[in-house]
Protein backbone atom coordinates (compact mmCIF):
# COMPACT_ATOMS: atom_id res chain seq x y z
CA UNK A 1 0.00 0.00 0.00
CA UNK A 2 1.06 3.59 -0.48
CA UNK A 3 0.83 6.84 1.43
CA UNK A 4 -0.03 9.98 -0.52
CA UNK A 5 0.50 13.50 0.75
CA UNK A 6 0.62 16.78 -1.12
CA UNK A 7 3.77 18.89 -1.07
CA UNK A 8 4.35 22.62 -1.22
CA UNK A 9 7.62 22.54 -3.15
CA UNK A 10 6.82 20.99 -6.53
CA UNK A 11 5.17 24.03 -8.09
CA UNK A 12 6.47 23.78 -11.64
CA UNK A 13 4.55 23.76 -13.93
CA UNK A 14 1.45 24.34 -11.80
CA UNK A 15 -1.42 26.24 -13.37
CA UNK A 16 -3.78 27.99 -10.98
CA UNK A 17 -6.80 30.23 -11.32
CA UNK A 18 -8.01 32.65 -8.68
CA UNK A 19 -11.63 33.81 -8.75
CA UNK A 20 -12.21 36.95 -6.69
CA UNK A 21 -15.51 38.52 -5.67
CA UNK A 22 -15.35 42.29 -6.08
CA UNK A 23 -18.04 43.00 -3.44
CA UNK A 24 -16.32 43.83 -0.13
CA UNK A 25 -13.11 44.43 -2.08
CA UNK A 26 -11.52 46.07 0.95
CA UNK A 27 -11.34 42.49 2.25
CA UNK A 28 -10.96 40.48 -0.95
CA UNK A 29 -7.99 42.48 -2.23
CA UNK A 30 -6.19 41.76 1.05
CA UNK A 31 -7.01 38.04 0.74
CA UNK A 32 -5.66 38.15 -2.80
CA UNK A 33 -2.43 39.83 -1.63
CA UNK A 34 -1.93 37.10 1.00
CA UNK A 35 -2.58 34.45 -1.60
CA UNK A 36 -0.09 35.97 -4.05
CA UNK A 37 2.55 36.32 -1.34
CA UNK A 38 2.24 32.64 -0.44
CA UNK A 39 2.39 31.52 -4.06
CA UNK A 40 5.47 33.65 -4.75
CA UNK A 41 7.29 32.33 -1.67
CA UNK A 42 6.57 28.78 -2.84
CA UNK A 43 7.93 29.25 -6.35
CA UNK A 44 4.75 30.08 -8.25
CA UNK A 45 4.89 33.21 -10.40
CA UNK A 46 1.72 35.17 -9.46
CA UNK A 47 2.21 37.72 -12.25
CA UNK A 48 -1.07 38.00 -14.20
CA UNK A 49 1.01 38.31 -17.38
CA UNK A 50 2.93 35.12 -16.55
CA UNK A 51 1.89 31.60 -17.41
CA UNK A 52 1.04 30.12 -14.00
CA UNK A 53 -1.87 32.09 -12.53
CA UNK A 54 -5.02 33.46 -14.17
CA UNK A 55 -7.25 35.92 -12.32
CA UNK A 56 -10.99 36.30 -12.78
CA UNK A 57 -12.93 39.08 -11.06
CA UNK A 58 -16.66 38.59 -10.54
CA UNK A 59 -19.26 40.95 -9.03
CA UNK A 60 -19.57 39.13 -5.70
CA UNK A 61 -19.23 35.86 -3.83
CA UNK A 62 -22.49 34.47 -5.23
CA UNK A 63 -21.01 34.47 -8.75
CA UNK A 64 -17.77 32.76 -7.72
CA UNK A 65 -18.96 29.10 -7.92
CA UNK A 66 -20.30 29.41 -11.48
CA UNK A 67 -17.04 30.84 -12.77
CA UNK A 68 -14.93 28.40 -10.74
CA UNK A 69 -16.85 25.47 -12.22
CA UNK A 70 -16.50 26.86 -15.74
CA UNK A 71 -12.73 27.19 -15.25
CA UNK A 72 -12.48 23.70 -13.75
CA UNK A 73 -14.32 22.20 -16.73
CA UNK A 74 -11.48 23.35 -19.00
CA UNK A 75 -9.05 21.08 -17.10
CA UNK A 76 -6.35 23.73 -17.69
CA UNK A 77 -5.85 24.29 -13.97
CA UNK A 78 -4.34 22.15 -11.23
CA UNK A 79 -6.39 24.06 -8.64
CA UNK A 80 -8.74 27.00 -8.43
CA UNK A 81 -8.81 29.36 -5.45
CA UNK A 82 -12.10 31.14 -4.69
CA UNK A 83 -11.88 34.38 -2.72
CA UNK A 84 -14.76 36.40 -1.36
CA UNK A 85 -16.30 37.94 1.73
CA UNK A 86 -19.90 37.61 2.87
CA UNK A 87 -20.67 39.79 5.88
CA UNK A 88 -23.86 39.33 7.90
CA UNK A 89 -26.40 42.12 7.67
CA UNK A 90 -29.81 42.50 9.25
CA UNK A 91 -31.67 40.28 6.76
CA UNK A 92 -31.49 36.55 5.97
CA UNK A 93 -29.60 37.38 2.75
CA UNK A 94 -26.30 36.36 4.42
CA UNK A 95 -27.61 32.87 5.15
CA UNK A 96 -28.82 32.29 1.59
CA UNK A 97 -25.65 33.57 -0.04
CA UNK A 98 -23.30 31.72 2.33
CA UNK A 99 -25.13 28.42 1.92
CA UNK A 100 -25.32 28.57 -1.88
CA UNK A 101 -21.73 29.70 -2.31
CA UNK A 102 -20.51 26.85 -0.08
CA UNK A 103 -22.56 24.27 -1.97
CA UNK A 104 -21.58 25.68 -5.35
CA UNK A 105 -17.86 25.62 -4.67
CA UNK A 106 -18.03 22.08 -3.31
CA UNK A 107 -20.07 20.96 -6.33
CA UNK A 108 -17.59 22.53 -8.75
CA UNK A 109 -14.80 20.50 -7.19
CA UNK A 110 -16.77 17.24 -6.91
CA UNK A 111 -18.15 17.45 -10.45
CA UNK A 112 -14.85 18.19 -12.16
CA UNK A 113 -12.20 16.47 -10.05
CA UNK A 114 -10.27 19.75 -9.86
CA UNK A 115 -9.47 21.10 -6.37
CA UNK A 116 -11.61 24.21 -5.90
CA UNK A 117 -10.51 25.90 -2.70
CA UNK A 118 -13.13 27.54 -0.48
CA UNK A 119 -11.68 30.94 0.37
CA UNK A 120 -14.91 32.77 1.12
CA UNK A 121 -14.97 34.50 4.48
CA UNK A 122 -18.41 34.25 6.10
CA UNK A 123 -18.35 36.58 9.08
CA UNK A 124 -20.63 38.66 11.27
CA UNK A 125 -18.79 41.99 11.01
CA UNK A 126 -16.39 43.90 8.81
CA UNK A 127 -13.94 43.86 11.73
CA UNK A 128 -13.95 40.05 11.74
CA UNK A 129 -13.36 40.05 7.99
CA UNK A 130 -10.43 42.44 8.24
CA UNK A 131 -8.90 40.41 11.08
CA UNK A 132 -8.94 37.35 8.82
CA UNK A 133 -7.62 39.27 5.84
CA UNK A 134 -4.50 40.73 7.35
CA UNK A 135 -4.89 42.47 10.72
CA UNK A 136 -4.36 39.31 12.79
CA UNK A 137 -3.67 36.80 10.03
CA UNK A 138 -4.27 36.56 6.31
CA UNK A 139 -6.31 33.54 5.35
CA UNK A 140 -5.43 34.24 1.71
CA UNK A 141 -2.09 32.63 2.55
CA UNK A 142 -3.87 29.55 3.93
CA UNK A 143 -6.06 29.22 0.84
CA UNK A 144 -2.99 29.31 -1.40
CA UNK A 145 -1.31 26.63 0.72
CA UNK A 146 -4.42 24.47 0.43
CA UNK A 147 -4.34 24.88 -3.34
CA UNK A 148 -0.67 23.91 -3.59
CA UNK A 149 -1.15 20.87 -1.39
CA UNK A 150 -4.29 19.66 -3.15
CA UNK A 151 -2.85 20.23 -6.63
CA UNK A 152 0.19 18.17 -5.68
CA UNK A 153 -1.91 15.45 -4.07
CA UNK A 154 -4.29 15.16 -7.01
CA UNK A 155 -1.35 14.89 -9.42
CA UNK A 156 0.05 12.04 -7.33
CA UNK A 157 -3.30 10.26 -7.20
CA UNK A 158 -3.92 10.67 -10.93
CA UNK A 159 -0.41 9.45 -11.68
CA UNK A 160 -0.93 6.44 -9.42
CA UNK A 161 -4.25 5.55 -11.06
CA UNK A 162 -2.73 5.98 -14.53
CA UNK A 163 0.35 3.92 -13.57
CA UNK A 164 -1.87 1.20 -12.12
CA UNK A 165 -3.98 1.20 -15.26
CA UNK A 166 -0.91 0.95 -17.46
CA UNK A 167 0.51 -1.91 -15.40
CA UNK A 168 -2.69 -3.92 -14.98
CA UNK A 169 -4.87 -2.65 -17.85
CA UNK A 170 -7.68 -2.05 -15.39
CA UNK A 171 -8.50 0.56 -12.80
CA UNK A 172 -7.85 -0.29 -9.15
CA UNK A 173 -10.78 -1.77 -7.26
CA UNK A 174 -10.93 1.36 -5.11
CA UNK A 175 -12.16 3.30 -8.18
CA UNK A 176 -14.81 1.00 -9.72
CA UNK A 177 -16.70 3.71 -11.61
CA UNK A 178 -13.81 6.07 -12.41
CA UNK A 179 -12.35 6.76 -15.79
CA UNK A 180 -8.76 7.75 -16.50
CA UNK A 181 -8.21 11.51 -16.72
CA UNK A 182 -11.60 12.74 -15.56
CA UNK A 183 -14.35 11.89 -13.15
CA UNK A 184 -17.81 10.87 -14.27
CA UNK A 185 -21.05 11.59 -12.49
CA UNK A 186 -21.26 7.94 -11.46
CA UNK A 187 -17.84 8.06 -9.78
CA UNK A 188 -18.77 10.73 -7.24
CA UNK A 189 -21.31 10.62 -4.46
CA UNK A 190 -22.18 14.09 -3.21
Swiss-Prot record:
Pfam families: DMRL_synthase. Pathway: Cofactor biosynthesis; riboflavin biosynthesis; riboflavin from 2-hydroxy-3-oxobutyl phosphate and 5-amino-6-(D-ribitylamino)uracil: step 1/2. SUPFAM superfamilies: Lumazine synthase (SSF52121). Keywords: Riboflavin biosynthesis, Transferase. One of its GO terms (molecular function) is 6,7-dimethyl-8-ribityllumazine synthase activity. Belongs to the DMRL synthase family. This is 6,7-dimethyl-8-ribityllumazine synthase.
Amino acid sequence: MAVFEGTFTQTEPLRLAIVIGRFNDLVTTKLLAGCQDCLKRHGVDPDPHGNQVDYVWVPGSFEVPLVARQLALTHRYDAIICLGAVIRGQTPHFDYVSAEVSKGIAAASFQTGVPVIFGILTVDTMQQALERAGIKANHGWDYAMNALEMASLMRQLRSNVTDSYTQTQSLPAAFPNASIGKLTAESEEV
